[in-house]
């Protein structure tokens, strides 16, 4: 990269970072690379699914940087992984092609090609799991073996498993890789037992370079001791030959109660990492990414509203977008307002429809009356102990009892940021679990509001 190219690219990144939220920047911009600037055309390498975001949101950034560095209007040519690899192959370098993929008849990897590290949204709740997964993909069998990823459903464990496999396969098309759920491993074991072909099963799994097992907790069943024995031997064969093993579970190794102790011990030989539900910023980034797949306009307040409604896992967010798409297509509308989104997701919300008819002002008034403070004080910045508690309780109830997004709630509390509302909500939620008197106070206020 020439000096001007480096200056230009640094300026693009600087401007992008100043305009985007951190989680959005990390996902859409961080991994992009400038290949060259030639004849006033910047060639930028990025994941293909991110091109639309760049076209919509970063065109002005590139124009600004272009005029600053080259005193010219810079056009953009986006190239994707496939383009670069084809170019490398023409230069005699090793690369991944569909033909190379098909030259591995001995092992069907069963990887899902749509999952990669590039399209995995990172946040504080999964950063260590992502870092460990990338480390394993870069040096399989040497860094963390096994890698054990645990967390609730819909948080990205399967995505990371496939991303590891796809990354390894990209670097080494001849790698023997197998992705399989523990349930399917059990099914294969039963079939081979019935057919008296256990040697085939052993050859299939014990000669792998990378074994990716999803939902290993399914193996923890006392009635399947024979399956545990086979997996134990498979694990040993791979580990002894420095072949990488990655496991996912909905619980820690120590909580796999029906699994043999010798397996649990081996699962803890390497690294155990946890994935927790995404925070608000990460959910916004996930939605910003996912809506690129839909031909609708999602205003920012709608995105933030949706991010505030589902805080347990990514699947709920994906399901909500499908519900919205169905309603929007039926009504033949292009722009998804908060009202349309609320109507579409009402049946999906785990706790049922919230009481959208309750004004936030009513909540503030009842909370203020209970704690002896005014609504004006609740909305202001004064931080005496009684006012702070009343303010946080009011925010908590606004989140619990209405469909309003976190930013909308913050606006009703003197223009506060959504992160302040989220902090108040989490704080009161935790306090309720520890302070019975506070729980009773809040229930009393809720009954008055209803």
Curated annotation (Swiss-Prot):
SUPFAM superfamilies: P-loop containing nucleoside triphosphate hydrolases, TrpR-like. Residues 329-450 are annotated as: Domain IV, binds dsDNA. Residues 84-109 are annotated as: Domain II. Belongs to the DnaA family. NCBIfam families: DnaA. Domain I is involved in oligomerization and binding regulators, domain II is flexibile and of varying length in different bacteria, domain III forms the AAA+ region, while domain IV binds dsDNA. This is Chromosomal replication initiator protein DnaA. It comes from Streptococcus equi subsp. zooepidemicus (strain MGCS10565). The gene is dnaA.
């Amino acid at each position: 990269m020439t000096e001007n190219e480096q200056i230009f690219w640094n300026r693009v990144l600087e401007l992008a970072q100043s305009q985007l939220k951190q989680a959005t920047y990390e996902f859409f911009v961080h991994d992009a690379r400038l290949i060259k600037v030639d004849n006033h055309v910047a060639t930028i390498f990025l994941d293909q699914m991110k091109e639309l975001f760049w076209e919509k949101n970063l065109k002005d950034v590139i124009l600004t940087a272009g005029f600053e560095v080259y005193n010219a209007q810079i056009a953009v040519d986006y190239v994707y992984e496939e383009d670069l690899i084809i170019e490398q192959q023409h230069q005699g370098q090793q690369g991944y092609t569909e033909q190379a993929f098909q030259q591995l008849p001995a092992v069907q990897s069963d990887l899902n090609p749509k999952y990669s590290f590039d399209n995995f949204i990172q946040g504080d709740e999964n950063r260590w799991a992502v870092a460990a997964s990338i480390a394993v993909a870069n040096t399989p069998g040497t860094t963390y073996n096994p890698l054990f990823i645990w967390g609730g459903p819909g948080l990205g464990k399967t995505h990371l498993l496939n991303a590891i496999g796809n990354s390894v396969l990209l670097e080494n098309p001849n790698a023997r890789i197998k992705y399989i759920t523990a349930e399917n491993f059990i099914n294969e074991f039963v079939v081979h037992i019935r057919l008296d072909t256990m040697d085939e099963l052993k050859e299939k799994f014990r000669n792998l370079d990378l074994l990716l097992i999803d939902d290993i907790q399914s193996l923890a069943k006392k009635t399947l001791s024979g399956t545990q024995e086979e997996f134990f031997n498979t694990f040993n064969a791979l580990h002894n030959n420095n072949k990488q093993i990655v496991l996912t579970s909905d619980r820690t190794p120590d909580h796999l109660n029906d699994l043999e102790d010798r397996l649990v011990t081996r699962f803890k030989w390497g690294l155990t990492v946890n994935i927790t539900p995404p925070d608000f910023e990460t959910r916004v980034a996930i939605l910003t990414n996912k809506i690129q797949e839909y031909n609708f306009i999602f205003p920012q307040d709608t995105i933030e509203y949706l991010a505030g409604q589902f805080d347990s896992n990514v699947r709920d967010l994906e399901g909500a977008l499908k519900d919205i798409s169905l309603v929007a297509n039926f009504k033949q509308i292009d722009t998804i307002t908060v009202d349309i989104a609320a109507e579409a997701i009402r049946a999906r919300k785990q706790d049922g429809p919230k009481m959208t008819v309750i004004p936030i002002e009513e909540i503030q008034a009842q909370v203020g009356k209970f704690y002896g403070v005014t609504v004006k004080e609740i909305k202001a910045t004064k931080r005496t102990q009684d006012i702070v508690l009343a303010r946080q309780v009011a925010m908590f109830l606004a989140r619990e009892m209405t469909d309003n997004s976190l930013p909308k709630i913050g606006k009703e509390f003197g223009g506060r940021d959504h992160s302040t509302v989220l902090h108040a909500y989490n704080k009161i939620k935790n306090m309720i679990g520890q302070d019975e008197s506070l729980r009773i106070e809040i229930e009393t206020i809720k009954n008055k509001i209803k």
